[in-house]
Amino acid sequence: MFVPRQLNVRKIKAFTGKENNSIADGNNNKLKDEHYKHNEASKEPSHSISGGLMLNQQDRQLIEPLNPDFLSAVDSILEIYFHRERQKEKVHLAFLIQQDDFWKGIRPNPTQNNLKYALSYVTNALFHFDNSSHMVIRNENIVLPLDIPLYDRIIYVEPVPATLSNKSLLLAGKLRKYLKEFLPYVDAIGTPEGYAFVILYKKVDQSALSKLPVPPGWVLLTRKEWTNREEKYFENQLHLVKASSSDVSNSSNSFPENRYPKLTKVEKQMTKSVSKTSQTDKDEDNLDFTKNLLTRIKNLHPLTNKSTIHSLLSYVFSRQTQNIACEPMYIDYRKDETEAIIRWKTPLHAETCINAFRTQERKQNSHDDIRAHRKKGSSRPFLIAELITGEEEKNYWRMLKK
């Protein structure tokens, strides 16, 4: 159907039979009927108008109720705003709309109309909305002294999907109906690592959190419980490191021959050239270790992991030489760090690793990048491999022996 661009079909009144003086011929009568159909269609609760014209966001709000997540997010955003800005007595809707960090991931996008609509449904003891001035005003009779330690009011959250962790206020809105007995919110802190922190006004314990009917897959932990689990994790990691160290020192006696292939002729010849610097060293603490097995890889992506580092090393080795296989005995890496310590099977492997990164000049551009190609415009620094020697090397092995 053809509709002239000059006509705004939303503003045209329905035709009644009394307006015949504006319709002069049969063509105009036909246009009148089409306009009437459009006007009738606009009354239906649909996202589109018959004929292909789409309703804009403002018109849609007059037809459909807002998403409950949007209402909860608006309520949570204002609670957190008034806690962050203790000196502010009121805030205009236009100011809230301009704060992009508030609305990350929240749909629909905020407008004055849908915020007014949302605030007409929100009831909160902390603030109220003045429709005439478009101001959200802090209630004068509400005083929130935070006399409970932060340690008892903070919650560690692992959401599903994990990408919600970087959209803290949307996450707070989704949790609102489950945490209502501990509200209001004081703050919400997001991270890109798959977890976030929510700070509440009231004290919360793990037994209460465990009983909440949160969505499947979500993890809610108190600060105390999260700290305990983190300590257990590090203890387990240290145990694995020590076990791996023991395996390295006893590999010649305890490992089956087929676990690690024998050195090729090329490897044996190259090993002879570095054998003088790879002899067993003993210090005053009776520390026994093989020198020149440790290399440090620097400038890794902070969100990478051991599996990705192993794949990256294998790829770099394959580009450096076909005669030496990539055989790291252990990758010592902690989450969020940009460095890793690699323990190799022989000093030859460590030397090959250092030479490979020196000549290939690679950059790890993302957490799962196993090729580390130099992309145009990338601001990431080059990956660097260096040999760990001297007192640092002794301290590393000494720590594993404890």
From Swiss-Prot:
Residues 288-402 form the xRRM domain. Changing W103A: Strongly reduced binding to ter1 RNA, leading to short telomeres. Keywords: Chromosome, Cytoplasm, Nucleus, RNA-binding, Telomere. GO terms for cellular component: chromosome, telomeric repeat region; cytosol; nucleus; sno(s)RNA-containing ribonucleoprotein complex; telomerase holoenzyme complex. Disruption phenotype: Critically short telomeres caused by reduced ter1 RNA stability and telomerase holoenzyme complex assembly defects. GO terms for biological process: nuclear RNA surveillance; snRNA processing; telomerase catalytic core complex assembly; telomerase RNA stabilization; telomere maintenance via telomerase. PROSITE patterns: XRRM (PS51939). Coiled coil: none annotated. Residues 148-230 are annotated as: RRM-like region. It comes from the Eukaryota. One of its GO terms (molecular function) is telomerase RNA binding. Residues 64-138 are annotated as: HTH La-type RNA-binding-like region. It holds the Pfam family xRRM. It is found in: Chromosome, Telomere; Nucleus; Cytoplasm. InterPro entries: La_xRRM (IPR014886), Lar7_xRRM (IPR045537), Nucleotide-bd_a/b_plait_sf (IPR012677). Residues 288-400 are annotated as: xRRM-like region. Belongs to the LARP7 family. Component of the telomerase holoenzyme complex composed minimally of trt1 and the telomerase RNA template component. Interacts with skp1. RNA-binding protein required for assembly of the holoenzyme telomerase ribonucleoprotein (RNP) complex. Specifically binds telomerase RNA ter1 and promotes assembly of ter1 with catalytic subunit trt1. Telomerase is a ribonucleoprotein enzyme essential that copies new telomeric repeats onto chromosome ends and functions to maintain cell division. This is La-related protein 7 homolog.
